[in-house]
């Protein structure tokens, strides 16, 4: 524990580009069976509060923009009023790319790095935020990943067409952190070309940019189903 505290103090003294966080919580959660996952309680607090708190308490995040649905603007603003890093709460778009772009537009121009994070990943740790931001400071683009445990099959028409080498596969998490100008340009290009984008790394990869992968955290799960929400309650109890 002492080593962790000392390491954190040393890292705080190292100069970093200013980094703002865009927390995307604008989806409709069609797999949640009618549960609004933004407001879904985990240990009696809405999920979005847990997520925002992690970035509020991070030493490497200067500013936070939350992107959500129109009807949640006021409730989210009220819930996050005690977090002084929250710069704005804005309305998302029709898809993830539009929502991320809305968040980028709301960030201050002096944020040279941007960390894009899923609002439905409430168990993000300061360690993962820290090492991803620092990697992006060095490489321009970075994301956390964890090794894939299951065997992955390429399936077409219900038939297996191939089995990728599992040792080369990683499940990519968020926050995904980029040079702000790079991400803005990559998303603009993807939008103009109507390119399918599954995450922000995909947009940057299309520009020929390499993304540095850092160690993620298996606890950094994305809440996408009611079962995930039950698992989240168990994970939260473990930390109490």
Model-derived features: positions:
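Hydrophobic helical membrane-anchoring modules
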Residues: 2-9, 220-240
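N-terminal glycine-rich phosphate-binding loop and ensuing alpha1 helix
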Residues: 10-71
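Residue-level signal for inorganic ion chemistry
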Residues: 23, 48, 103, 117-118, ...
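Short, high-confidence coil segments that cap the C-terminus of an alpha-helix
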Residues: 61, 111, 138-141, 209, ...
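Short phosphate-binding loop-to-helix
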Residues: 81-114
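Conserved core of the sugar-phosphate nucleotidyltransferase
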Residues: 123-214, 240
């Amino acid at each position: 524990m002492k080593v962790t505290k000392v390491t954190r103090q040393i890292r705080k003294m190292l100069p970093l580009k200013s980094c703002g966080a865009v927390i995307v919580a604008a989806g409709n959660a069609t797999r949640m069976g009618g549960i609004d996952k933004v407001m879904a309680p985990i240990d009696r607090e809405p999920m979005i509060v847990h997520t925002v708190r992690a970035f509020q308490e991070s030493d490497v995040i200067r500013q936070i923009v939350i992107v959500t649905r129109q009807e949640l603007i006021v409730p989210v603003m009220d819930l996050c009023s005690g977090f002084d890093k929250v710069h704005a709460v804005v309305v998302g778009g029709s898809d993830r790319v539009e929502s991320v772009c809305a968040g980028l537009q709301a960030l201050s121009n002096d944020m040279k790095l941007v960390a894009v994070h899923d609002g439905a990943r409430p168990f993000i740790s300061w360690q993962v935020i820290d090492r991803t931001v620092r990697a992006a400071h060095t490489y321009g683009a970075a994301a956390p990943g964890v090794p894939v445990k299951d065997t992955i099959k390429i399936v077409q028409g219900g038939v297996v067409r191939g089995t990728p080498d599992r040792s080369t596969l990683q499940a990519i998490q968020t926050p995904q952190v980029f040079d702000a100008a790079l991400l803005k340009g990559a998303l603009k290009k993807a939008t103009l070309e109507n390119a399918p984008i599954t995450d922000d790394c995909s947009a940057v990869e299309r520009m020929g940019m390499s993304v540095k992968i850092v160690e993620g955290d298996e606890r950094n799960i994305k809440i996408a189903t009611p079962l995930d929400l039950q698992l989240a309650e168990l994970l939260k109890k473990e930390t109490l």
